Amino acid sequence: MAILKHPKVDALETSLSEQLKRDLSDQELFSFAPFDEEEAEQTGASNYSYWRSTLHAFSKNKVAMFLLVLMLSIVIFTFIQPMLPGQYDAFAVNNGANGLPLKNKQPSAEHWLGTNSIGQDLWARLWSGTRTSLFIGLTCALIEAAVGILMGVLWGYVRKLDVLFTEIYNVLDNIPSTIILILVSFILKPGVGTIIFAMSITGWIGMARFIRNQILIIRDRDYNIASRCLGTSTWRIIVKNLLPYLVSVIMLRVALSIPGAIGSEVFITYIGLGLPATVPSLGNLINEGRKLMMSPNLRYQLIYPTVILSIVTISFYMIGNAFSDAADPKNHI
C-alpha cells in the first residue's frame, strides 16, 4: 500500500536535508586551532601613540611645517652667526681708512646690511638683537607657563583655594600690566633680567585664569570622580587626568605668549625704558630705525628688524594654532 505524503511535508524534508548539507560543508571549512600555553599568556597591546599621532597630524599642515623650519633656521642661525668667518662684532664701531666711524653706510660687500648712525655693522646687530629678543620671549613664556599652569590647576581643582586665588587675581588683574612694566623697568637697573622680571610679574595671570576655567569644565567628569573614589592622590589626578587633556590649549597659549613678550620688549624699549641702547635687540633696532624713517636712503635700518619681528610673530602664531589643532584629543581616533 503506498504511503501518501502531504506536499508541505516533502518540502520540509527537502529544506532540512539541504540545511544539513550546508552545515556539514561549513564544518569542513573550519578546524580547531591547537592550544599554545605560551601564546595564551601573552596580552595584546595597542600601538597607538598620542604624540606620534599628534606629530603625524601636524606634519600634514604644509604651511606650519614651512614656518617651523623657517623659525628653527632663524633660531639656529642667531647662535652660529658670530662663529662664522668674516663676521663683525655687534658692539664694535667700524672705522674707515681715515680713522672716522663709518656712519650710515649703505649695504655693500663689506657690510651686507650697512652700518648704523655710529658705525656698527647692522648685519651683526640684527642677528644679535634677534637672539636677545628670542631669549627674552622664550624665557618669559616658560616662566608664565610654569607659574600659570601651577596656579591655575590648584585654583581650579582645590576648592578650598578658590576664594584666596580669586582675590589675588582680582587685585593683580585690576592693575594695568603696562603700568607695572613701566614702573619696574624705571625703578630697577635696565637689563635683560629686569625686562624678564617685569613681564613675568603679571604675565602668568592670564594663563592661570584660562587653566582654571578649563579645569572647572573637566574636574567633575566621571573618570575623575571615580579616581577620587578609588583614593587616587590629587597630584596623580592632575598629572594623569587633567593636564594631558589641556596639552593642545597650553601649547597654543605658550606659542602666542612668545611673540607677545617680544612685542612688550619692543614697546618698553621703544619708549626708552627697556634695554640700554648699547644692547642690541629688536626693540632697540626698531627704535633706532624709527628716527631715520623720514630719510629715504636710511629707511632700510627700520625695515630689517621689522621684517624679522613680523616673521617671528606670524610664525609662532601659525605654528601654535596648527599644533593646537593637531594635539587636540578630540581630533584623535
Question: What is the predicted role of each segment?
Answer:
Residues S185-K189, Q214-I215, G263-I308:
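Glycine-rich helix-loop "coupling/hinge" segments at transmembrane-helix boundaries
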Residues R131-V147, W235-F267, F316:
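Transmembrane alpha-helices
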Residues F66-L70, I136-C140, I168, L181, ...:
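Hydrophobic core positions of alpha-helical segments in small-molecule transporters
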Residues I74, V153, I182-F186, I195, ...:
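Transmembrane alpha-helix boundary and packing residues in multipass membrane permease domains
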Residues Q120-F135, K160-D162, T166, D220, ...:
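Amphipathic cytosolic juxtamembrane alpha-helices at the membrane-cytosol interface
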Residues W112, I143-G148, V153-I217, M251:
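Generic hydrophobic transmembrane alpha-helix motif, especially the helices
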Residues G137, A141-L142, S200-G203, N213-Q214, ...:
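Residue-level hotspots within the lipid-embedded alpha helices of multi-pass solute transporters
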Residues A2-I149, V153, K160, N174, ...:
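Gly/Trp-centered helix-boundary motif
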